[in-house]
Amino acid sequence: PMTLCVRTLYRVFPEIRAFGCCHEVFGTQRFLARMVEEVFQQESVDRHEIKVNPVGVNHFTWLTQASWRNQDLFPVYAEFCEKHRDGYGEKPVDDNWVNRMFQCREQVKMDLFRRFGYMAAAGDRHLAEFCPGKWYLADPECVREWKFGLTTVDWRKKDLKQRLEKSARLVSGEEKFRMNDTGEDGVKQIRALLGLGNLVTNVNLPNRGQIPNLPLGAVVETNARFAANTVTPVFAGNLPETVYPLVARISGEQQMLTEAALTRNLDLAFAAFTNDPLVTVLLSDARKLFDEMIENTRAY
């Protein structure tokens, strides 16, 4: 929903100054840092040492450049992906990947690199969401084969309940708030906006030309420069030809869905729904599913 939220803000209030933050690229930087440690026998490589150029949409970003201490990591990554065809990282005790909601063996992102030549920069469970449905999400067995986890609705409900309970304890004073580093860039972004230094990090903004081959105004994710009272997108270049069809389809669907919601146009919403790469059923079945979802969420 990140892209849709940012797009809606600018659609309703064009003068707004808003941006969307996401840590998926950070996770890919950490993954590449672990690769650097293995390949170059380094210790404790920080993700900030991995310099990247992300292009795409939220949760479906691609790196067209990645380096460590001025060394191009693409050739290194190509060899790394071949070496770790069975996955990378520690294997969990429970090998049922359907129950390992936030763990993966990075197989999806490495498969996408071998096929398209660019680094997919998000967690495997998110990357799978934006690819054609039969690739990685055909059924639970397919998920197990690709060794990533699915987040269940039951877990989300329990997690929300626990977080609301924690909030209540903090408000009442029953629990003391503890300051710690979350690994996010939010504080650094605010400091930069206040004029306390500059920062370059990846965020979601309307396309002003930072990705020339996606529509102007579409919300895209690239690096941006934060400085006193300003956030300026960094020119990232075109989406590569190999991944352009995948990303352009998602971007178009997101724009359709925003327009459908704001104009209350169910026909346009259905067109966006059937355009989604995960919708692989017959049109008649898609219509039944769509109508059922609309009816069951009507109260909201």
Regions of interest found by a model, annotated:
Residues 1-66:
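Internal, well-ordered domain-core segments that constitute the primary functional module
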Residues 37-300:
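Long, compositionally biased stretches enriched for glycine and/or charged residues
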